Amino acid sequence: MQKATYYDSSAIFGGYTYQGANGFNYNASQQQYPPSSHVESDYHRPACSLQSPGTVPHHKPNDINESCMRTSASQPSHHPVIAEQQQQKQPPPPPPPPPPSVSPPQNTSSNSTQSSTSKNPTLTSQATISKQIFPWMKESRQNAKQKTSSSSSVESSAGEKSPPGPASKRARTAYTSAQLVELEKEFHFNRYLCRPRRVEMANLLNLTERQIKIWFQNRRMKYKKDQKAKGMLTSSGGQSPCRSPIPPSAAGGYANSMHSLATSAPYDPHSPTSFSKPHQNAYAIPTSYPGPLNSCPPPQKRYAGTAAVTPEYDTHPLQGNGGYGTPHLQGSPVYVGGNFVESMPSSGPSLFSLTHLGHPPSGNMDYNGAGPMTSNHHHGPCDPHPTYTDLSSHHPSQGRIQEAPKLTHL
């Protein structure tokens, strides 16, 4: 296809009467020497292919073909130099090497072909020079890229502390044990360094100020995390006993430490115990079990419950069936179902510190057990000879403190 284009170009320029240095013009040469034109078009294909219309778009095709014909016609030396300068201004991709063997009609060609062959080594040398320069320049850029990528990969393998980016390529600082000891000692005395001390430590430890500042920032964050973890541990450890239900012995100790209680006699383990105390020491223990009012005078107190009241009973809203005794009697806290509760005097409109329990208008308080209390239980005033063992007739003025007896059935 290239041959056809160059034949066409030679036919196009056949009409021009362009005279070379040796006196030959193109009109006669095209007719007299067809083999020479064939050889010229074959031989100068690399020089013309260097400046094809595709690679050099700002040149007209006529100018390119004219430059090719000028080189083939062995003009004076300034014309090929201009073409070669144009070649160097726009370096194309490296051309294919020229054919090593030339066809035999070259020997019978005119002086123009001989001069073109003598001119050809300069063209090939220029092509090889451009071929050496342009890939060498390109290769140097690639080498620079490879060097930067290899250096960045080495730094990343060494371990980067900063996030990856083109601007930050600072490697992770490795502190020696002596430096760490000095830094920890300084942090123990002062968590925030002033600048003079930081400069002094930087000179002492052979570090930069920035490294010391960043180490102190990280150490403060670690200290804050440790303190937060310790605080959570202590708070969870301190709250766990409070959330757990109070055992009977602990509840008894709490009641005895708050108020001096009288001695309680041994009893059947299924029945709760009653502790006598003065009226002015009445208080509401934060439990949800109201105690009934006792209708006995203090020397003849009875137990406020029966064996039917089990420790697992649940408190219900107050009801009006079978209220206890007469007003203006002393209230006493009652140990019912593993917790101490207290009975309030019925003389005034006092309430428990409980949100879901109200005070009945009659002034009498009642509670319901796990099963309703049957009618055969004795709810009237105590007789002078109680069924259960009486409490000690001595009041808390004796100062004796008695713990609640341990229940064996729980």
UniProtKB/Swiss-Prot annotation:
What segments bear the compositional bias annotation Pro residues? 90-103
Q: Name one GO biological process term.
A: anterior/posterior pattern specification
PROSITE patterns recorded: ANTENNAPEDIA, HOMEOBOX_1, HOMEOBOX_2
Q: What is its main location?
A: nucleus
Q: Which InterPro entries match?
A: DUF4074 (IPR025281), HD (IPR001356), HD_metazoa (IPR020479), Homeobox_Antennapedia_CS (IPR001827), Homeobox_CS (IPR017970), Homeodomain-like_sf (IPR009057)
Q: Name one Pfam family in it.
A: Homeodomain
- Keywords, ordered alphabetically: Developmental protein, DNA-binding, Homeobox, Nucleus, Transcription, Transcription regulation
DNA-binding region residues: the ranges are 168-227
Report residue spans for region: Disordered.
Answer: 29-126, 139-173, 368-410
Q: What are the protein's GO molecular function terms?
A: DNA-binding transcription factor activity, RNA polymerase II-specific; RNA polymerase II cis-regulatory region sequence-specific DNA binding
> Which Gene Ontology cellular component annotation is one that this UniProt entry carries?
nucleus
Q: Where is this motif: Antp-type hexapeptide?
A: 133-138
Q: Which family does it belong to?
A: Belongs to the Antp homeobox family.
What PANTHER family does the database record attribute to this sequence? Answer: HOMEOBOX PROTEIN HOX-A3, PROTEIN ZERKNUELLT 1-RELATED
What does it do?
Sequence-specific transcription factor which is part of a developmental regulatory system that provides cells with specific positional identities on the anterior-posterior axis.
Which protein are we looking at? Answer: Homeobox protein Hox-A3
Q: Which species is listed as the source?
A: Heterodontus francisci
